[in-house]
Amino acid sequence: MPSRKKKSSVTKTKKKTTGKKARVTAKAKPSVKSKLKTVKRAPAKPKSVTVAKTKSKKEKAKVVSQPLPKTAEKKPSAPPSETQQPKIGENAAESQRLGFGALLEEAKNKGYLVHEDLINLLPNDYADPSQMEGIIGRLTEMGIKVFEIPPDADSLLLEEDTQSDDDEINEDVAEVLATETRTTDPVRMYMREMGSVELLTREGEIVIAKRIEEGIRQVMGAVVQYPELIEKFIKEYDTIVATEGRLSDLLIGFFDEEESTASPVAPEARDKEAETSDEDDGGEGGSDEFGESGPDPLITQQHMEELKKLYGRYQNAIKRYGKKAPATLKHQKALAELFSTFKLSIKQFNRLTGQLRRMLRAARAQERLIMSYCVVKAKTPRKKFIASFPHNETNMKWLEQYKNENKEQAKRLEKYSKEIYRAQRNLAQLEEQNNLNIQEIKEINRRVAIGEAKSRRAKKEMIEANLRLVISIAKKYTNRGLQFLDLIQEGNIGLMKAVDKFEYRRGYKFSTYATWWIRQAITRSIADQARTIRIPVHMIETINKLNRISRQILQETGIEATPEELGRRMDMPEEKVRKVLKIAKEPISMETPIGEDEDSNLGDFIEDINMESPVDFATSAGLMEATREILSTLTPREAKVLRMRFGIDMNTDHTLEEVGKQFDVTRERIRQIEAKALRKLRHPSRAEKLHSFIEVEE
């Protein structure tokens, strides 16, 4: 007796039908892009259900018929109407959901997905690039990377293993398919993604902080295998001590397992202070007091002396017994345990790991060069090269052995032998410079990369779980010159700094510590970016204090505070108060619309002091015209003398001697002509025309 199954059940394996053959007719509607086939059932035959499985565009939909239980065969029904036929949309959605499930299950097992497989599975409705980006984003969040081509084993070496779970896959399918219908508003998308992460308890914060610490210690333990880095670190410490530099540039502190985990005194007071000071403090509210002052010099000196002692023993053991000797490994382990307790500054940490990466890049560059000559140019099989070359990077006899193994390509290998030997010599030189062989360089970098990845994942979890804290603090700083999204972005930067410097052993909750860093980042960004004209941070603090006292006076008296009152309250000279009030004014755009119709700008009403006013221009024009008219009543000689003497219609005036040379007479004669012309102009008939201009000038 066959078991009862739903009519829409789908089988993922091919099954042969038993009993009577079912008549199946498939009719595809052109509007359906998933290429699923509908089923029409014959009236006299048992009902059957078709199942379609879509693998790719190249494979046709496969139809499998399956007989229904006998209870369904007793009452053959009439041919179904259009309304009774299966809904194509529902079948397409179900098939699409199941197809996604199979794809995600396979992708989670492999850890990646190929872009072509994703496109083949999606219907044509998902051809929009924005929708495709959204789906790829959701897959990335699930831990599934999308590649253009299948990655090699090295790319997946550090990836975490993923486990397939039916319920989890079904949830992931729903999330991916829902991506298309979600909003594209960035704020809503950010809020939705932020809300999907659960808040952390105190215990959860400690667990993540320990994971961060474990990853950092793993990196520090790997660094010890490269002795030159330890020696360089010791030299930098000696330089800082000799020059009285800042220890915080080198160290933040030390990981101490025995450090007290008791709660600090009155953390509630600090929380309250953080909340009350959010409103008015505009400076570096969360200053760099957390982790920036550096460790205690005496404690640091003790740790460094111990480090120097262990490093000296390790170097002596290498010289006496060699790197692989048990005694040397014992000293190396002790050195690694001590050095892993050092909490380096971010700059110093990146400097040490950066040197290791540069070594690896140099080695990889030479290896790729050798592989290019052997595989690409000499046409030797890639698998043979990968099997033969490792552990023979600097073996100068390897090429001869490789030619014997590949006799068909021996001539081509001989052609590029000089280049291959040169690359091997470069690798040997790299080993000699760093006292490490190529395999050791790769192993150190592998351990460093794993430790960094572990620490980075834990930091990401801590940051995502505390994004709500940034929102709550950023809300208090709106309408201060920066948009809300910019405030969130700056607050998130402060949150990331807080995660880097958080010390769970002090007993504080992370939110108590991070609040100061978030506030500091937001207020600093407001001071730097909000104003068109940047004002120093200390002046911003003075302005905020002035505004706060001004509001208090207004609430107490109901009258705006005068500069004298503000000066008395702030113990500040009145002149400085006026200067601060002047600086506090915000610039206004000259393009600001004015009036109800907004048909004019503010710049149209601002006086241009460099331009002559219309009244002065009209007066000057009238005076010039009247002067020319009066001069026309004189003789040409007298008029020209006056014009030259007073610079009328000329660039400049002239002396008596200059005018005399012009007329070829003495300067005394020019003075007489000038005096006679001026007496004529003083006549009332002529002077009357100039009286009005004299009154205006007065």
From Swiss-Prot:
Family: Belongs to the sigma-70 factor family. RpoD/SigA subfamily.
Keyword Cytoplasm: yes
Quaternary data: Interacts transiently with the RNA polymerase catalytic core.
Region (Sigma-70 factor domain-2): 462-532
Alphabetized UniProt keyword annotations: Cytoplasm, DNA-binding, Sigma factor, Transcription, Transcription regulation
Annotated region (Sigma-70 factor domain-3), positions in chain: 541-617
Protein name as annotated: RNA polymerase sigma factor RpoD
Annotated region described as Disordered, given as residue ranges: 1-88, 259-298
Motif (Interaction with polymerase core subunit RpoC): 486-489
GO annotation, biological process: DNA-templated transcription initiation
Main function: Sigma factors are initiation factors that promote the attachment of RNA polymerase to specific initiation sites and are then released. This sigma factor is the primary sigma factor during exponential growth.
Gene giving rise to this polypeptide: rpoD
InterPro entries in UniProt: RNA_pol_sigma-70_dom (IPR014284), RNA_pol_sigma70 (IPR000943), RNA_pol_sigma70_r1_2 (IPR009042), RNA_pol_sigma70_r2 (IPR007627), RNA_pol_sigma70_r3 (IPR007624), RNA_pol_sigma70_r4 (IPR007630), RNA_pol_sigma_70_non-ess (IPR007631), RNA_pol_sigma_70_r1_1 (IPR007127)
PROSITE patterns per record: SIGMA70_1, SIGMA70_2
Alphabetized GO MF terms: DNA binding; sigma factor activity
Chief location bin: cytoplasm
